[in-house]
Each structure stands twice: as structure tokens, then as C-alpha cells.
Amino acid sequence: MINLIVFFKEKKRHLLKFLVLLFISISHHAYSQHEFFHELVLEKKLMENEKWELIGEANFKHLYNEPAWRRWGASFAGARKMNRFSLFGGLNGYYTFNRNITNFFEMRPWTAVQFKLPIVAKIVLRQQLKYEWRFFYTEEQPKTKENYGRLRYQVGLDIPIPAKEESSWTIRPYFEWFFIKDPAEFERFSNERDFGLMAIKRFKNEHKLSFGFTREVYYDLFAEREYGYLFFVGYSF
């Protein structure tokens, strides 16, 4: 049994090295290709117990390529935890703006179901199916209102890194698919297929610091296929 535990620990260390090298390689490629974003997220757990969780979040997202835009957002979400399953519901609000785009507000109520399955050596397979209702309100004259629904499916792994300290690291690679028929004309990135890699540091006080990179393949009304690269930093307390 001890030899088996040592074996899986070595495997996880090799996997971590591979994921870090992959992250560096993709990041280097991103600077010279397509569109580049960053996103900052601050998350607060308003309530948490064995069955329920309530979370508030503020975020900022920025596209650097022209025509560039910025987006401020706030969201609230609740979760009902049931062993390996969790049910979620929430409401996100966003304001996207810049001088050279159609500025707009977005309200996004959503619901989701998540399933976690332990595999081996504390590695967990995580799947989430999410449906969003997106309501857009533009500022320019004449003002317009558009809305549609979007389905999202994400699958990924939570890979804990062995550590003697109370604080720890988790590596989270994942894929996500977005499905929609008729996007709004001013919404550029409604259909996507994403690959992401996130590193999560959990401190002794249960706060978490997250770093992530996502490669996005998306489709819009004006181009068949484009690529985006998102760098993410988040803090949860």
C-alpha cells in the first residue's frame, strides 16, 4: 500500500511538471497570436455549511486587441450540496464598454448541476452542465434589447499536489463547450470551445488564490473561427 501511494505521488509530480511546461508554451504563443484578455475576480463566501453555500463575486475583464473593451461585473450564486451532486443558481450582471464598441448592459440568470467523481489518489473528475439566460440592453440610440439562452458543458480534473503543510495546491485542467443558435449582433464571443488550466493555492485560513490560462476557440457573426487567450487571477475568502 505504501509503495502504491508513493507511485501515485510521483505520477502527480510528473503531471504537474507537464502541465506547467504546457502552460508556459501556450502563454508564449498567445502573445503573438489572435486576441489577448485578462480577468480579475474577487470572491466572498457569504455563507457555507454542509448543505448550502452562498457566494458573492466582483470581476473585471479586459480585451487588449482593437477594438478593445472593458467589462465590470458582479454576481451572486447559491449552491445546494448533495454528496457528489451540487445544484446551483445565480445572477450575473455586466457592463461592457469602450469608445469604439456598442456599450451594453447584460443580466444573466443561470442554473447548473455539477457532479464530482473521485477517481484515484484524491484526483476528482468534475462535470458541470449549465444553462444561461442572457439579456442585453444597449446604450446607443436607438436603444435595443436582445436575449437568448446558452448551454455550457464543462469537464475537468481536480489534481491535489501532496504537501506536508496545511496549505496546499490543486491543479485543474478542463475543457468547456458553449452551444447557441442565434447570438446577439453586438455579442462577439457567444459560441466557444475552451481549454483551460488553473492552479489553486489554498491557505491555512481556507482563503484561495487562483491563477489560470484559457485558450478559446470561438465563432461569431463576422468570422468563421478565431482564437482568444485569457489570463485569470482570482482570490476567494
Segments predicted by a language model, with ranges:
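Transmembrane beta-strands of outer-membrane beta-barrel pores
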Residues: K44-L46, A58-Y64, R80-R84, L91-F97, ...
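Outer-membrane beta-barrel transmembrane domain signature
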Residues: K122-V124, Q128-V217, F237
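Residues on the lipid-exposed face of transmembrane beta-strands in outer-membrane beta-barrel proteins
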Residues: L40-K44, F76-R80, T111-F115, Y131, ...
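Bacterial Sec-dependent N-terminal signal peptides
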Residues: M1-H38, F237
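Hydrophobic/aromatic-rich structural module bridging two neighboring secondary-structure elements via a short loop
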Residues: A68-A121
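Outer-envelope beta-barrel architecture signal
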Residues: H34-F36, E50-L54, N83-L87, A121-Q127, ...
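Short glycine/proline- and aromatic-enriched beta-strand/turn motifs that initiate or cap beta-hairpins
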Residues: Y31-G73
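Residues that define the transmembrane beta-barrel architecture of outer-membrane proteins
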Residues: S32-H38, R70-W72, F105-P109, K145-Y153, ...
